[in-house]
Amino acid sequence: MKDFSFEKVKMWIKQELVLTIALLLGCVSSFFNTPKMHYIDWDVLAVLWALMVVVAGLKTVKFLDWTAIELLNRCATYKQVVIALVGLTFVSSMFVTNDVALLTFVPLALVIGKTIKMDMPRVVILQTLAANLGSMFTPPGNPQNLFLYAHYGYSALGFFKVMLLPTVLSVIYIGVIIYFKRNHPLQLELPALEKPDRKLTTIYLVLLALNVGAVLHLLDKYIALAITAIVVLVVNRKLVKQVDYSLLLTFIGFFVFIGNISNTSVVSYLRDHVLGTTEGTYLAALVSSQFISNVPAAMLLAGLTREADALLLGVNIGGLGTLIASMASVISYKLFAAEHPYQAGGYLRMFLFYNFVGLVLIGFVTYLACIVNYINYLDVSQFRELSEFLNW
């Protein structure tokens, strides 16, 4: 019985590795510094919970599935099918997060792959790229954006201005890959889903808009949370159980850890000498994301740097690269490997190729256009201020 329990614990730790690390860091660091309640950003947790419960509602009415099938049945060529699958993933990830977009549209792609001949590894990889790159354009697109948006007090316009260039570059990169795909006519006849309940769908879409508005500072977060909680408890209280509470606990663990170490000498050194520059922060975010994933990287580095734009760009573009750079990539890999176990190795090789090419291209162009130009702007501004001072 003890062995069985130990195996269950091992399996849980394996499944919730990031949560385990976050809680360990939070607990261990608390032995050296007494944690305080204000370390935890309750605003972020409130918005995250509300968004997750609303997205769970949209999943229950199969709104995204129905929309996808209606669109796909209108496609007349292979390339149109690929564009539809990838495009739906890209756009939806901006509002329902990259994880949910992949959990919705990758299984649909795998089902289509059983009815027509498709290059399934490439299609799923393109969907993964679309989810990770599309989600970076909006604050609610992924957890790291939601956290950084609140942590640094971004305005909606300021956030979109920072993320516009890498998003455009992402569209170009994915578009070029699809453009060189062979094309041929086909006719999909996917079984139609029952039309989603209009009343419930409208309620969940209104709640989604309400909470996106709260993220963008158009509405008080706790008013949006209260409305969402009341409506969900009345309409379908089972949705409360479908929230990813492990993600919320992960955030709490990192909040406590960051608060505990924020005033240590090591952190002060890193803040002043490594992450005190725009370039250093950008590169640190890119590299650390490859090894610990971009959500933990964002939360850890945010406590060490004031270079908000560089960190935001770095952890989002850093979602490209290794399989664990973005946990959303792990989701699509598991879905594909479960359906095509003998192609898992080939999938990984192709995944790494497209991801690292995208990381280098998008990362380098963004570095030149945003990071270097920003540094040059600072240099010019400082020189102008010095000249004015000397003339005075």
Regions from the PLM with identified roles:
Residues 4-6, 69, 180-205, 237-241:
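Flexible interhelical linker loops that connect adjacent transmembrane helices
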Residues 8-14, 35-44, 156-165, 194-197, ...:
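Interfacial loop-to-helix junctions that mark the boundaries of transmembrane helices
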Residues 39, 56, 61, 65-71, ...:
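Transmembrane helical segments that form the transport core of multi-pass membrane transport proteins
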Residues 87, 91-136, 299-313, 341-343, ...:
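Hydrophobic transmembrane alpha-helices that form the pore/transport pathway of multi-pass ion
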